[in-house]
Amino acid sequence: ITLICRLAKEKGINYKRVTETKLNNMSRGASHQGVIAMGACAEYVSLEDILSIANEKEEDPFIIICDEIEEPHNLGAIIRTAEAAGAHGVIIPKRRSASLNATVFKTSAGAASWLPVARVSNLAATIDMLKENGVWIYGTDGEGQSYTEVKLTGPIGLIVGSEGFGMGRLIKDKCDFLL
């Protein structure tokens, strides 16, 4: 198992050590030999790909940014809602986030099959890159303005914070507006 973890790290593959009980639950009683691999059901795209999609449509970018959404059902619901709202894509962090899996696809009602999702190493740096491309960053926060009081036009990146804690401090500090 140590070798598998070392090789995964060398290849930039995320891994997580869990308890035997967790492995048993994940394998649903099947033999796991102490290791379970989980892969994405779809390929991720780059941030540039999402910006290009908006550009090709001659539209201002509308991007949903997920800050540590860990529950796959919630990520699927966000993707479904983003697609229905006309977003050009969704951004998720590589760490501390649900990934594209069967649960996300099912909950998204198929939207995860066609709405591009970018998985980034550094969410804060990605937000900076969006700002450099003229995108205004709106964060969802209990202390923000009501979205009905704001004219949401132009290039928009909308941040949705984690289930338990909302946006992290660094991410919140990067917002141009709070809703």
Please state what every model-predicted region is.
Residues N24, E43-V45, P72, A98, ...:
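Glycine-rich nucleotide phosphate-binding loop and flanking beta-alpha elements
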Residues M26-A40, S108-A111, P116, T153-G161:
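Short basic, glycine-rich beta-strand/loop surfaces that mediate nucleic-acid
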Residues Y138-L179:
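Active-site/ligand-binding-proximal alpha/beta "capping" segment
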Residues I1-N14, S52-E149:
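RNA substrate-binding interface of SAM-dependent RNA methyltransferases
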